[in-house]
Amino acid sequence: MVLPTVAIVGRPNVGKSTLFNRIAGERISIVEDVEGVTRDRIYTTGEWLNRKFSLIDTGGIDDVDAPFMEQIKHQADIAMTEADVIVFVVSGKEGVTDADEYVSLILYKTNKPVILAVNKVDNPEMRNDIYDFYSLGLGDPYPLSSVHGIGTGDILDAIVENLPVEEENENPDIIRFSLIGRPNVGKSSLINAILGEDRVIASPVAGTTRDAIDTNFVDSQGQEYTMIDTAGMRKSGKVYENTEKYSVMRSMRAIDRSDVVLMVINAEEGIREYDKRIAGFAHEAGKGIIIVVNKWDTIEKDSHTVSQWEADIRDNFQFLSYAPIIFVSAETKQRLHKLPDMIKRISESQNKRIPSAVLNDVIMDAIAINPTPTDKGKRLKIFYATQVAVKPPTFVVFVNEEELMHFSYLRFLENQIREAFVFEGTPINLIARKRK
């Protein structure tokens, strides 16, 4: 199911990231009391009253070198293009500013719900000052102190009230996959080559894909697929120079919708920090993952090239040890015929269910190979395990004391389960829980 998107917009230093962290329930953006410091995680999942939504802190997408008004205009552009609900954060301490009026004019022209959050209302006396914000023409202002958590519930109530109606679940028989990666790694060319037709504009200039495009196709065995392209960021025909920053958000939305993610790397340029960041999002989301090295035809090779590349990938993506690697060329179509079958196998692994009796046989065999650890004379006891979810496969291991389950032993059990049941290309989760 596609999660609705909520974008937090506002000029620097009004508390966007603090509100983001409050809603997310954790400190995942870098927050300092200096303008423009949000440079870390900008995307997470929020939940309120049993409604889940994707949350974007647009401050994390600002170009620090861009002029001030251009930065906030970019934020508004992002919100208008991508968000279902916009939270416009202003400062109650500073009152209405020219920048606030500028953004409000842009947001007013959208047909999207805008929630006006007046932050830094840290004491009751300041509540009278929020009425000045009615002049922005965006409806009732909500007093908020995101530092103290006061008023956050009212903001969340308003968000949920304005979220679009939940869509019915998509056809579970269709495998949905996306191609993610830096601009100009060849995602569009890969799509064209897989489909055998020019469905997407492919150009050597980074960021030229005009919008995200879903394409459906059927393989020779009758399996249906939906392919999601994520390249580019469009607003009135203009592609921003900071394409990588904007493509992060587009990739996040595609990852949400995908069963399997193809992490595309440009063989000509090698692995970059951006690649690891995006791959980390896919891993944390529990998606099936294939590492696709594109433009393989363009580099010189010897008998050691493949093994050197594989070692480099494993070193840089240690958290993706389960992900298969394939070297392809969109230009020559080298190995592209293997991708649909790989995607299908990984989707099957994502949905695989293991009977409890069989699972516990593997757990007991694992304990026989490597006995459970002890801590201060007390030994970990494993009573039984059961699978509780798929996509990704998730198992609960019931024990005498959760604290005795060291991370290393949990990883050992995970590897034993993965090997026994051939979980290809998917993370699997093991959770230790005390038996009651």
Swiss-Prot record:
GTP 1 binds at residues 10-17, 57-61, 119-122. Keywords: GTP-binding, Nucleotide-binding, Repeat, Ribosome biogenesis. GTP 2 binds at residues 181-188, 229-233, 294-297. InterPro entries: G_ENGA (IPR031166), GTP-bd (IPR006073), GTPase_Der (IPR016484), KH_dom-like (IPR032859), KH_dom-like_a/b (IPR015946), P-loop_NTPase (IPR027417), Small_GTP-bd (IPR005225). The keyword DNA damage does not apply. Residues 352-436 form the KH-like domain. It holds the Pfam family MMR_HSR1. SUPFAM superfamilies: P-loop containing nucleoside triphosphate hydrolases. Associates with the 50S ribosomal subunit. This is GTPase Der. It comes from Streptococcus agalactiae serotype III (strain NEM316).
